[in-house]
Amino acid sequence: MERSPEEGAGPEPSGQSPATDSTRERDGGSGVPPAGPGAASEALAVLTSFGRRLLVLVPVYLAGAAGLSVGFVLFGLALYLGWRRVRDGKERSLRAARQLLDDEERITAETLYMSHRELPAWVSFPDVEKAEWLNKIVVQVWPFLGQYMEKLLAETVAPAVRGANPHLQTFTFTRVELGEKPVRIIGVKVHPSQRKDQILLDLNVSYVGDLQIDVEVKKYFCKAGVKGMQLHGVLRVILEPLIGDLPIVGAVSMFFIKRPTLDINWTGMTNLLDIPGLSSLSDTMIMDSIAAFLVLPNRLLVPLVPDLQDVAQLRSPLPRGIIRIHLLAARGLSSKDKYVKGLIEGKSDPYALVRVGTQTFCSRVIDEELNPHWGETYEVIVHEVPGQEIEVEVFDKDPDKDDFLGRMKLDVGKVLQAGVLDNWYPLQGGQGQVHLRLEWLSLLPDAEKLDQVLQWNRGITSRPEPPSAAILVVYLDRAQDLPLKKGNKEPNPMVQLSVQDVTQESKATYSTNCPVWEEAFRFFLQDPRSQELDVQVKDDSRALTLGALTLPLARLLTASELTLDQWFQLSSSGPNSRLYMKLVMRILYLDSSEMRLPTEPGAQDWDSESPETGSSVDAPPRPYHTTPNSHFGTENVLRIHVLEAQDLIAKDRFLGGLVKGKSDPYVKLKVAGRSLRTHVVREDLNPRWNEVFEVIVTSIPGQELDIEVFDKDLDKDDFLGRYKVGLTTVLNSGFLDEWLTLEDVPSGRLHLRLERLSPRPTAAELEEVLQVNSLIQTQKSSELAAALLSVYLERSEDLPLRKGTKPPSPYAILTVGETSHKTKTVSQTSAPIWEESASFLIRKPHAESLELQVRGEGTGTLGSISLPLSELLQEEQLCLDRWFALSGQGQVLMRVQLGILVSQHSGVEAHSHSSSSLNEEPEVLGDPTHTASPVLEVRHRLTHGDSPSEALIGPLGQVKLTVWYHSDEQKLISIIHSCRALRQNGRDLPDPYVSVLLLPDKNRGTKRKTSQKKRTLNPEFNERFEWDLPLDGTLRRKLDVSVKSNSSFMSRERELLGKVQLDLAEIDLSQGAAQWYDLIDDRDKGGS
């Protein structure tokens, strides 16, 4: 702001100011007071004043007449005084702001203790330039803008309000005046932009207006309004893109970088909003509404040319970058806690608030510490550079009100220029310093350096969230042909987008099945190779799903510039329902020359830390990896198949022992310190259990499997025999399938099959193992394990102290599913050494996780970790051996390794070696005349029959089935996997299920039915059915599979969508491959 000598000239040397002269003219011009009103006017004024004071006493009288206590009167008085205090404060602020804007030059000179003539002409502010010419234009335009606002509110807004609610049919604007005080542009700053097609402007906007807007609802005699308002903030204006045609600028974007300050002076019924409590609540709600469309990252876009390209990206552009903020520590903080009425000075319980724009993070509280160590990491999106700031505020946690300890601010532009900043920053408004490491992560449009980023992130001990490797921006545009609600009503669609446990929602679009959203959503990705984007299109009630989409983010890694811009077909929706989205992924990359992080395991200056005072021994170096003993990871899994028994002793007697009955046998197993038990088979001397148990065993010699058979009785169970099997033979041979003669009884034998499953450090065979387990799974057994997890917990460091000074007595709890292992307790130390191992059976490695809690005796949880096992599947040798950061303070050194459970007699080796030549027959181990085990058969047929046929799908769709015969159990097994491309009759999608009959019987004994799937043409069932039949009886039957749908809610009629009939004599039941079968109409005679 430059001032010329003419502008700095003082006022005319007159004893009176122009304002005084004009006042005198209004009062009569001579300084003599005007003639007073008559006696009647004076009496009326006195009566009015008396009436107002009398009116104040009316609430007091009413409270006394109603029998209310004096507390209600005092409460009302307190509310009134609070309202008056807020009201007077707003009016004073409004008057001061108006006075400042009316006489800015004089007040500025007085503040500098100079007269107008003494203010030098060379005083200027090079960053911000005055724009008085713009203010003069606004002054001239302001009355016409007021006329436009009056027409807009009266002709557009008022009718909309009256139509929205029947109670507001008498709503009107009784007064609309923008006043004489227009918006002022205090200064303009033009930023040099790195892009040639963009101009950045910052406008310092100040509005201290005397506007008055009054509304009235005549039906309820309700009046309300606004009389005066203040708004101050920095408005950024972006002119982009610059084009070669008029008007040169393609669009204008406007937004506030920070939330502006707002102060409203209410009138009428809205005076109630000035009551303390309501005042802050109403101001916050209004500011939230403004921020929802005009505060970064939201912006107002005004296109200036038609058919502008990339409007969605202009409205929500890609971030400029990501800043990874490492909040490490603070030192020299002031003490705020006092004891014994301030006589004893304590410490503080500090925590930090980190803000960048609207993104806010809160650290954990460190109790009683003036030099806290947080060691926390946050990732923030930077939308605009320059302009945004990193702000850190430190507080002392108190039960009532937290005490302020200091703050620091830093422009994000400095981080962009430096790449990495690692400094101690002084706290303003307090004492002490805060230690921050700030890293600028660039956004790369290709996946070339993704592996390098993932490898680096694995070494970062980040809390409370793991470090991100990429960012995903989803531009949700529109949808087409969504299904209608019941009664052919238009839905109110909205969209839920989820990546792992982070879910964001779009706004709802009302009464349309072709909604347009035009919204942007941003997600941080830890590993885009394994994560998915889940999209659910729902009605605004969230109860009705209109469509769904699951998109593996690995698809973007192979797309051009990591971008997909296309229509996506919705599942569980209409046949033509689709969603248009633009997905943009960017890899977060830190320059390799700066990849050095103090919080990396092993990278801290542990060796440079001096030992305790008085010690002459150097501190031992911190280990990088664990050192487990030689027995760790050598466990195997023993799978025990308890099949059947024969010729058991009859123990039941009736009529005092005169009538001999049978027995109710069950089997009890004891092995490796565990006790297992089958179910009871009622009244059978030749029972079939067909149950499977799994036990983790070691190779220690001398172990035995104790088997006992009992008859279940009401009082005491009767003994039916026992047998002991040495585990050394089974562990060496890997397989045992024998009839065991029971000992200590006259008769009886038990059929037992034992398998040793050796864990393998490769995930190549996992999918095959999971599918084989699903096929050999019995109904009476728990789900079979697919992997073995071995954990070695060595030590922990830097655990939090009790009450800030006393070390805890920590122990750890390892949990997977419902299985837990508790370590020993190490007394009074923040660096315990456990050196303990534990093993867990894993049934679904993709879905399960390892939970670790470090607890202290009497102090609760000190820290925790949740490690998804899916991360191990991506590691070489399926193993992680490093330091892991706890969610609280501290770290643990741990080795976690996974082994896939593959039977040595399952035929996997034969397939893996012969897969290169499909013509080669798999090698059969052992005696060629010996019947192959069912597991071998299953594995062999999976390798050749699992892929679906590529033939054309029939007009009624297809059903996927697996049919095979289990020779050992003498059961026919059928698995209904799924259907695809089913027929749709009418506008509503079917609710399909599958009904299975074993012809020629049509009774309930052979009928099976799957669960029902809602509103889909591609249902997934994966349900298994069994029939106890001999092989010869099975070959004389046909399997009738019908896909049906409920025709309506009130009707019991079932609509046939298609069927297929399989002659079991024409199928190779030993192969049992999963195959797709064409559905036919009931009138057709064909097969599949």
Swiss-Prot record:
Stretches assigned to the SMP-LTD domain: 127-305
Residues with Phosphoserine modification: 316, 809, 933, 947
Residues at which Ca(2+) 2 binds: 337, 349, 396, 398
One Gene Ontology cellular component: plasma membrane
PTM per Swiss-Prot/TrEMBL: Phosphorylated on Ser residues in insulin-treated adipocytes (in vitro); this promotes interaction with SLC2A4.
Domain of life of the native organism: Eukaryota
Record-listed Ca(2+) 1 binding positions: 336-337, 396, 398, 403
This protein's UniProt keywords: Acetylation, Calcium, Cell membrane, Endoplasmic reticulum, Lipid transport, Lipid-binding, Membrane, Metal-binding, Phosphoprotein, Repeat, Transmembrane, Transmembrane helix, Transport
Protein name per Swiss-Prot or TrEMBL: Extended synaptotagmin-1
Organism, as annotated: Rattus norvegicus (Rat)
